[in-house]
UniProtKB/Swiss-Prot annotation:
Thylakoid in keyword set: no
Family recorded in the similarity comment: Belongs to the universal ribosomal protein uL24 family.
GO terms of biological process kind: translation
MF-aspect GO terms: rRNA binding; structural constituent of ribosome
Pfam families: KOW, ribosomal_L24
InterPro entries the record matches: KOW, Rib_uL2_dom2, Ribosomal_uL24, Ribosomal_uL24_CS, Ribosomal_uL24_KOW, Translation_prot_SH3-like_sf
Protein name as annotated: Large ribosomal subunit protein uL24
Transmembrane segments: none
Length: 81
């Protein structure tokens, strides 16, 4: 374990259904796609969408602007059964 980083037990895990209880997306439900226990953050499907600018590649010769989910704090979600 690195200095200054504590491993925190998360109340949710990947593929759990959760509901956002605070923030801009309050009331939205979705599935957890990824968990970051060291930062106490989660990525929820369809929540906290942000635009990412991609530079030109073989896949995107002109470059692209993609919408992706960004992490939110785990305390802002509640598990839904």
């Amino acid at each position: 374990m690195k200095l200054g980083i504590k491993k925190v037990k998360m109340h949710v895990k990947k593929n759990d259904m959760v509901k956002v209880i605070s923030g801009n997306d309050k009331g939205v439900s979705g599935k957890i796609l990824r968990v970051f226990p060291e930062k106490n953050r989660v990525i929820v499907e369809g929540v906290n969408m942000r635009k990412r600018h991609m530079r030109p590649t073989q896949e995107y010769p002109q470059g692209a602007i993609l919408e992706r989910e960004m992490p939110i704090h785990a305390s802002n979600v509640k598990k839904v059964s």
